[in-house]
């Protein structure tokens, strides 16, 4: 199922961890799919239009998968409101951040690092107020 011009649902439900643990990571409600489509249209597609292809490393997570990867108990990934974006380099990540901060719809924008690996967590709420939180986290 196509969520926007360049993003399909399978990019957001694909998970090596789910496959390894035998967890079926599929959206369980229309709301989750609508939330992912909103995230794509308002945040990810504009980023892709500006910079070319981007890689989603984590999108939708059903609760069992979210627990298995150590996600927060109230993670927006479980509602289809969030995605983690692979960063090919720190410089490219800084370009992504600068652009994402200019978008009119943004709930959270988090620069995350675990050792030498960095990624950006981005979220947008289709319903409710977007907080425009900017943070960084070192795991």
Question: What are these model-predicted stretches?
Answer:
Residues 1-48, 136-139:
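Extracytoplasmic cell-surface/polysaccharide-interacting catalytic and binding patches
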Residues 27-28, 54-60, 91-96:
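N-terminal start-of-chain detector that recognizes signal peptides
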Residues 32, 36-43, 65, 81, ...:
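Amphipathic alpha-helical interface surfaces
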Residues 41-70:
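Extended, low-complexity, intrinsically disordered C-terminal regulatory tails
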Residues 51, 78-82:
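Short connector loops at helix/strand junctions that flank enzyme active sites
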Residues 74, 79, 87-139:
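Catalytic cores and adjacent binding grooves of peptidoglycan-active enzymes
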């Amino acid at each position: 199922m196509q969520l926007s011009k360049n993003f399909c649902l399978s990019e957001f439900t694909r998970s090596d961890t789910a496959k390894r643990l035998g967890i079926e990571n599929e959206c369980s409600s229309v709301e989750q799919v609508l939330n992912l489509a909103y995230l794509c249209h308002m945040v990810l597609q504009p980023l892709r239009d500006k910079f070319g292809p981007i890689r989603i490393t984590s999108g939708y997570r059903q609760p069992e998968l979210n627990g298995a990867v150590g996600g927060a108990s109230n993670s927006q990934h479980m509602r289809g409101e969030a995605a983690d974006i692979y960063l090919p380099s720190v410089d490219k990540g800084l370009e992504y951040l600068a652009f994402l901060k200019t978008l009119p719809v943004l709930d959270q924008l988090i620069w995350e690092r675990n050792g030498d690996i960095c990624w950006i967590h981005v979220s947008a709420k289709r319903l409710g107020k977007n907080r425009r939180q900017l943070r960084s986290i070192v795991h």
